[in-house]
């Protein structure tokens, strides 16, 4: 008989955000979007800033914003080790918009002291937060 669920743990340095049985996980890996379901091949990959859409064993969904991290898939267990993880409901749209504006302003600064890689990463995190907020407002 095929597996119907797999165990998922989502943890950050601050806390454990999710632990339980799931039907599926949609997440942004370093090479693009990933769909993880029971029976998925073992995998280890880095994660980009974005949304983790969790479909729990009972069919309900939970959305978590991830700033990046690592994903490990084993036969009966999936682990997300996030740099920073926040439940979508706890994201602050105004703060994300302000962070995006700051990053864009820093990107357009004409000084030689701009660390473009750091500014681009800051911009990617802010845009990813806004996408999660928009996706969850459509979901609700």
Curated annotation (Swiss-Prot):
Q: Looking at the UniProt record for this protein, which Gene Ontology cellular component terms does it annotate, in alphabetical order?
A: plasma membrane; proton-transporting ATP synthase complex
Instruction: Indicate where this protein resides in the cell.
Output: Cell inner membrane
Which key words are in the record? ATP synthesis, Cell inner membrane, Cell membrane, CF(1), Hydrogen ion transport, Ion transport, Membrane, Transport
Q: Which Pfam families match?
A: ATP-synt_DE (PF00401), ATP-synt_DE_N (PF02823)
As for membrane topology, the entry says: Peripheral membrane protein
Any idea which GO molecular function terms this record carries?
Answer: ATP binding; proton-transporting ATP synthase activity, rotational mechanism
Specify the superkingdom. Answer: Bacteria
Q: How does it assemble?
A: F-type ATPases have 2 components, CF(1) - the catalytic core - and CF(0) - the membrane proton channel. CF(1) has five subunits: alpha(3), beta(3), gamma(1), delta(1), epsilon(1). CF(0) has three main subunits: a, b and c.
Role played: Produces ATP from ADP in the presence of a proton gradient across the membrane.
Q: HAMAP family attached here? A: ATP_synth_epsil_bac
Record-stated family: Belongs to the ATPase epsilon chain family.
**Would you tell me the protein name for this molecule?**
ATP synthase epsilon chain
The scientific name of the source species is: Colwellia psychrerythraea (strain 34H / ATCC BAA-681)
Q: Which gene codes for it?
A: atpC
